[in-house]
């Protein structure tokens, strides 16, 4: 199969948090592959130069280049949808516990979820909280019925195109789970929504946490689909720019992409507004220097891991057909393609492959495994669980990377 697509790439020239153009490169990633691309292998599948940038005015991190979203998020090229498994249920419970601390009057809540991708979170929250009404908003729903079987209204649009619907529904609670990191300009999107929504609306967002990504050395989770990399400081600066007040912020160490951050806010009462000073120059320079060191450690460690995998003789197998496998292969210098196969417990992935990684996926029940097979955990989202399973089930040698 030969890929003839030549997707457009646009340069992101302003910070999505404060609008500054004072951006500097932290990390160059030439020919970075697309993640989550399951399908028939194509050696010519597109790769794109990428850079991780830091705003020298506020310290926020974001990508330099935006690959055409029509390519990135097409059904053929983007696998992620909110899944239905134990890990996701734990993340939903975390959000529910977070909401309970906001002491919402559920019977008065008219909720909308933006960037829903499917109805799983909406069903979960609506069942647990008995909101007055619940709607979901995502272009993926453009061909679906207005109401689903759970009484949830479906709006097949981008949030910025659904402002009349938001007004019609008298929304006073808006939630978005893993949405803002995909948005080119979060400040502009939220400004637009704030101008067209009840001023007392409570907003709740979950995003990957840059703090936890750095702490866990999950720099493999820097990838094309995530334009923005939030930490506590950048969220607070964003809210200040929007004239909003932070109500609550919590970190989920077991969240996606190394860990997540959930925060709630609302429009600030002008009478009580406080403009905090940001002594940022020294802080940003320190952050820039620390990131450079952390990235150097990461790249060195994964190069060693890749060299070791390639050096090992005999049969070698990965465990975990992860969404991020393409970036793991990238940072290990193609070592994942030196494995014989990838095991995965998901029966739907059996005999599948990746469009940009030359390796097949096999269910454990279908694989020929003996005591000489060497295992490499290849899903860092489930790293500990995989090591535990391998230790209990297979008396084999296990090669782990620098992530725990």
Model feature map: region roles:
Residues 2-85, 250-252, 264:
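N-terminal juxtadomain amphipathic helix
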Residues 213, 217-285:
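Contiguous mid-protein beta-loop-alpha structural module that forms a pocket-lining wall or clamp
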Residues 78-82, 174-178, 216-222, 290-291:
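Glycine- and acidic
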Residues 98-217, 227-244, 327, 342-350, ...:
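Conserved SAM-binding loop
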Residues 46-51, 59-146, 223, 228, ...:
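Extended interfacial segments that mediate partner engagement and assembly in macromolecular machines
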Residues 98, 103, 124, 262-404:
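Hydrophobic, well-ordered beta-alpha structural blocks that scaffold small-molecule cofactor pockets
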Residues 138, 156-157, 250, 361-363:
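Short loop/edge segments at beta-strand edges and connector loops
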Residues 30, 37-38, 148, 215-219, ...:
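Short aromatic-enriched loop/helix-cap "lid" or pocket-rim segments at secondary-structure transitions
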């Amino acid at each position: 199969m030969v890929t003839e697509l030549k997707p457009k790439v646009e340069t992101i020239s302003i910070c999505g948090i404060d609008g500054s153009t004072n951006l500097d490169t932290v990390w160059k990633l030439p020919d970075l592959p697309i993640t989550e691309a399951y399908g028939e292998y194509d050696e010519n599948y597109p790769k794109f130069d990428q850079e991780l940038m830091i705003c020298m005015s506020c310290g926020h991190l974001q990508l330099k280049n935006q690959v055409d979203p029509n390519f990135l998020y097409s059904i053929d090229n983007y696998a992620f949808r909110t899944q239905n498994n134990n890990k996701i249920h734990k993340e939903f419970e975390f959000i529910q516990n977070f909401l309970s601390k906001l002491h919402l009057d559920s019977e008065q809540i008219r909720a909308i979820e933006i960037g829903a991708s499917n109805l799983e979170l909406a069903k979960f929250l609506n069942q647990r909280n008995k909101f007055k009404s619940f709607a979901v908003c995502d272009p993926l729903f453009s061909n679906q019925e207005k109401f689903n079987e759970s009484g949830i209204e479906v709006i097949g649009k981008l949030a910025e195109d659904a402002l009349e619907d938001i007004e019609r529904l008298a929304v006073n609670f808006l939630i978005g789970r893993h949405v803002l990191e995909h948005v080119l300009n979060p400040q502009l999107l939220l400004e637009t929504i704030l101008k067209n929504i009840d001023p007392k609306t409570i907003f709740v967002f979950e995003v990957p946490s840059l703090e936890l990504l750095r702490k866990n050395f999950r720099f493999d989770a820097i990838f094309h689909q995530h334009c923005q990399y939030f930490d506590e400081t950048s969220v607070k600066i964003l809210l200040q720019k929007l004239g909003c007040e932070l109500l609550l912020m919590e970190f989920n160490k077991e969240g996606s992409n190394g860990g997540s951050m959930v925060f709630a806010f609302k429009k600030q009462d002008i009478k009580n507004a406080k403009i905090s000073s940001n002594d940022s120059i020294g802080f940003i320079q320190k952050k820039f220097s620390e990131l450079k060191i952390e990235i150097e450690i990461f790249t060195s460690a994964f190069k060693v891991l890749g060299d070791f995998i390639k050096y090992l003789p005999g049969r070698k197998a990965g465990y975990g057909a992860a969404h991020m496998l393409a970036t793991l292969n990238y940072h290990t210098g193609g070592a994942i393609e030196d494995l014989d196969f990838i095991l995965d417990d998901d029966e739907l992935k059996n005999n599948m492959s990746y469009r940009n990684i030359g390796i097949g996926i096999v269910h454990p029940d279908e694989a020929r495994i003996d005591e000489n097979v060497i295992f490499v955990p290849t899903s860092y989202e489930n790293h500990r669980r995989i090591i535990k399973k391998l230790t209990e089930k297979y008396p084999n040698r296990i090669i782990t990377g620098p992530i725990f």
